[in-house]
């Protein structure tokens, strides 16, 4: 099994990779399967049921909207975010949906989109089942999918096999643990990012890798730029006001940016997460709920570190990807499975290690930075108020971005030797998530979600 950096960093839409990006992909997979098996023309209606965290917080995360767009053939990378809401309202009001854009059928939204708030499927907290029926009401096709975090989707056929979309690509330097990654670095004399580059060559040539990563950086930059200019109230009913644009104006008027670096980092992260909360174009990094941390630290590198350039951006994202794979392989990046430690904690760890890489850190210092970034997010709960990716998510990304820079700086002051390994902290995160009550796993049934009144 192999994971590419482009699996972890994918261009999509907000507000959630597990509740928006994944379900859209799953619904599109279902519709395409109908067409590929020559069943599409016989379909007269479809039904969708969302379970677990998808059912509990799906409305706040835009899951039904994502499913409808996916059934119509849209993908997270290319969907027109400006027209999406109007299209969904048309489906609801007309009672009709066009599968893959060319097969119109009946769809009674109130009856055919079912959210089970307290019922879960056994494999994963983010489960969804889709049915297709013919004109006589006979079942044409039924499929169950699981959105396992970061936009990754597996179907029921993969249950009991691998947790990741299967890929048997042979890598030059395969690794599954931090210890294996460090051993390869010592044996080859390569940096973490250089090892990752060699592995990415299994799918693409170096020019394609570079261009793909710089495209991800361009989308991250555009997201920050939009977030720092747009104002108003975020959707969803909490009446949360955007703050990034006003903060940006104040910081620009207050003098020396170097003296305000940490405030700029916080701003970059909040700008991304305000855009994400509004359903804008973002990059999963490795999830949408934590999408602001890596762009914020990467902006810090480009704007505040002397000598920063696009080569450094490529190395940053490659190193971050290597660390993210360790979390994906050995624990989880899903808030519905392990709490926010799996989302914000993983992103903080990835950003810390990547910053150490571009600051000239050794593989041991990179691993140390990543470990610090995760260690101090252990136990972090996922308790979104109103089921929306707004409170505490937006500010939390800003705090974690600053923490990532601090972790990298701490690691760079040492020689890479430390007591707690990255592997041990990943194992601890997984165990902590298993012990955590379901109330704190993206269900909006505990923590801030029940102590803050929605108004």
From Swiss-Prot:
What name does the UniProt record give this protein? L-serine dehydratase
Q: In which pathway does it act?
A: Carbohydrate biosynthesis; gluconeogenesis
What molecular function terms (GO) are annotated for this protein?
4 iron, 4 sulfur cluster binding; L-serine ammonia-lyase activity; metal ion binding
The reactions it catalyses are:
L-serine = pyruvate + NH4(+)
Q: What is the lineage of its organism?
A: Bacteria, Bacillati, Actinomycetota, Actinomycetes, Kitasatosporales
Top-level enzyme category: lyase
Query: Any idea which UniProt keywords this protein has?
Result: 4Fe-4S, Gluconeogenesis, Iron, Iron-sulfur, Lyase, Metal-binding
Q: Which cofactor does it need?
A: [4Fe-4S] cluster
Write the gene name: sdaA
For this chain's record, the cofactor binding note is: Binds 1 [4Fe-4S] cluster.
EC number(s) for this protein? 4.3.1.17
Q: Identify the InterPro entries for this entry.
A: ASB_dom_sf, Fe-S_L-Ser, Fe-S_L-Ser_mono, Ser_deHydtase-like_asu, Ser_deHydtase_bsu
